């Protein structure tokens, strides 16, 4: 492999060190996008997933040269909102986003999340019914995948995505067919 190789996509999960679910949420996202290390024979998406948090009053930078496209997922809870270290860091991320170097998705885990930075647009937020990734895990996965697809394909918010879903028409319980029909009619 040459030293010029870049992975197509990398994802960074950012959370405040005082977020009690931050590390656990990072691991779940890692298993979702990269692979589940406790099941080594299962295939995964193999998207590199890294974390960033505010240890020792600093946050390591995101390496935008590692991949062709980079996503930063901000887990915006009350701790991140109240921590001034994140203010500058998010400003730096927004500059990189303006330059096309990365895309920011913020997850609303606090009623104050929209106020963390006025330059973060509401469309950039993944909003969950209960503001809790653990209880809204299925909803979070759908919204995350939707945002990733839109970013990779340069789709705008509101623009319809077209997906091809392969299914078996001969499965005994007809689960594949019924799932395909329900998705088609969604």
What residues fall within each predicted segment?
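Short glycine-/acidic-enriched loop or helix-start segments at secondary-structure transitions
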Residues: 83-86, 116-117, 175-176
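Acidic metal-coordinating catalytic centers involved in nucleic-acid phosphodiester chemistry
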Residues: 108, 116, 128-131
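Conserved beta-strand scaffold positions in the cores of enzyme catalytic domains, especially
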Residues: 104-106, 124-127
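Conserved N-terminal substructure of TIR/SEFIR domains
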Residues: 1-75, 93-100, 131-186
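Glycine-rich, charge-decorated loop segments at or immediately adjacent to ligand/cofactor-binding or catalytic sites
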Residues: 112-125
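Amphipathic helical hotspot of TIR/SEFIR-family domains
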Residues: 68, 74-112
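Residues that flank catalytic or metal-binding motifs in active/ligand-binding sites
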Residues: 103, 121, 161
């Amino acid at each position: 492999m040459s030293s010029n190789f870049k992975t197509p996509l990398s994802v960074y999960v950012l959370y405040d060190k005082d977020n009690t679910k931050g590390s656990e949420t990072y691991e779940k996202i890692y298993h979702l996008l990269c692979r589940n290390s406790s099941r080594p024979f299962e295939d995964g998406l193999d998207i590199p997933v890294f974390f960033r948090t505010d240890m020792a009053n600093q946050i390591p930078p995101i390496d935008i040269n590692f991949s062709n496209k980079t996503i930063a997922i901000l887990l915006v809870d009350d701790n991140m909102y109240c921590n001034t270290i994140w203010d500058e860091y998010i400003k730096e991320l927004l500059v990189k986003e303006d330059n096309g170097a990365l895309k920011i998705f913020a997850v609303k885990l606090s009623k104050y999340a929209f106020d963390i930075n006025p330059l973060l647009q509401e469309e950039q937020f993944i909003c969950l019914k209960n503001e809790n990734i653990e209880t809204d895990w299925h909803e979070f996965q759908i919204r995350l995948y939707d945002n990733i697809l839109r970013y990779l394909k340069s789709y705008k918010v509101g623009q319809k995505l077209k997906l091809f879903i392969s299914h078996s028409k001969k499965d005994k319980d007809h689960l594949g067919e019924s799932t395909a029909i329900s998705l088609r009619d969604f």
